[in-house]
Amino acid sequence: MSALSSNRLPNRASLVTNRAFSALEGFLHVEAFSGIVLLLAAAAALIFANSQYASVYESLWHTPLGFNFGHFTLSWDLHFWVNDALMTVFFLVAGMEIRREIHEGALADFKQAILPIVSAIGGVCFPALIYLSFNFNSEHTHGWAVPTATDIAFALGILALLGKKIPANLHVILLSLAIIDDIIAVLIIAFFYSTNIDPSGLAIAIAGIALVLFFQWIGLASAWLYILPGAIIWWGLMITGVHPSLTGVILGMMTPVFPTRTLVAPLTILSNAMQILQEKNIKTDLHHISTALKKMRKGQRDMIAPVIRVQKTLHPWVAYGVMPIFAFANAGVSFANFDLSSHESFLVVLSVVIGLFIGKPLGIITASYLAVKSGLCRLPPHMTWTGILLIGFLAGIGFTMSIFVSMLAFKDIVLLDSAKIGVLCGSGLSALAGLGYGLIYIKRNKNKKVLHNLNGIK
């Protein structure tokens, strides 16, 4: 029997490496198609909430779920598990993406990051001011943050529908802006929607953070081991009064961006595995083949930074599992008891719709224009103001994040439903505007290229 051909192994190793380091491309791909799943989940929730099965839909989320451990009982309803526990995983992935962008992405270079940072700030301030102008001197001012959020999945999903004719720079700026938007949303939740702060829980959360740092210091690389300190942080934040799902952001931002240190270098492990596979008669020795392949997998794993490895594993679960479940649990608004003749409800709906549909693009393009004209930053190559406006429309798709904030802002069920309807309408209008304007944007770019080619011929 001849030895394994050496030319096949590098191809396999190259394939594995390419898969591991295409994190950004995979992120965009998953986010884009998960937008469709989110839309279906939201539509299903609305159908159930306004059908003969509405009572079943409502009672489902009030189903108690928990466990007993001796005399210790832990039990919450299903709605709590979705919004406070499951969403922690979403914020974990968001935190990791923020960490990566700061380390090696669009936010790593401050000059490059100025445009999306300024745009995101404008896209938060304008919708908030619009909301406050409609609800000034009322009891509903605490809902000002509802129209400030951006749903990355939906925004990138609409962009994906427009095809590959959209410049790559536009994808990068939209993603960077949405990530900064997430950072601002996290800060808003932490500082404005955390009530009745109890300092006793802070010590528990700090202990959990210290345990994470200790695990990292001794070189523990398995993500499963960090569930314990994560649970401690989550419990501490809940006692403190801060929304416990922000545990995900803390863990995500603490995830190492460099490969974990090992006793044997990953390249040495891969080299040893290659030597084993290149030995004669290896095809007949299943034990040696299995051992070599295990070493290759370990070497590959050790070469990849935990922030990339864990995010790559969790991201599809969040995009196709956590977010659709959240949408199905919270987008079900019953129109039966909704009354637009109520002045309070009408103002909440109107301010959220206008904040998302008009405030977002207006804030983004105004802030960007002022930043560029003042010399603070420049537009990236091949980026035009029409492209910035397209980003503004897509950023107005608040959906899941806006619904999440509305649930923290409103305790009154009528006003909460009003805010949700405003989010659904505003996000829907923004999506349609983004899709329609995107088609116009593509056509304009195509015509410009045709004219450029004709001028070149002349």
Curated annotation (Swiss-Prot):
Pfam families according to UniProt: Na_H_antiport_1
GO biological process per UniProt: regulation of pH
Any one GO molecular-function label of the UniProt entry: sodium:proton antiporter activity
NCBIfam families membership: NhaA
InterPro entries assigned: Na/H_antiporter_dom_sf, NhaA
Keywords: Antiport, Cell inner membrane, Cell membrane, Ion transport, Membrane, Sodium, Sodium transport, Transmembrane, Transmembrane helix, Transport
The gene coding this protein: nhaA
Family: Belongs to the NhaA Na(+)/H(+) (TC 2.A.33) antiporter family.
Catalytic reaction equation(s): Na(+)(in) + 2 H(+)(out) = Na(+)(out) + 2 H(+)(in)
Bilayer topology annotation: Multi-pass membrane protein
Cell compartment(s), UniProt: Cell inner membrane
HAMAP family: NhaA (MF_01844)
Transmembrane segments: 27-47, 78-98, 114-134, 143-163, 172-192, 201-221, 222-242, 249-269, 316-336, 346-366, 388-408, 421-441
Described purpose of this protein according to its UniProt entry: Na(+)/H(+) antiporter that extrudes sodium in exchange for external protons.
Protein name: Na(+)/H(+) antiporter NhaA
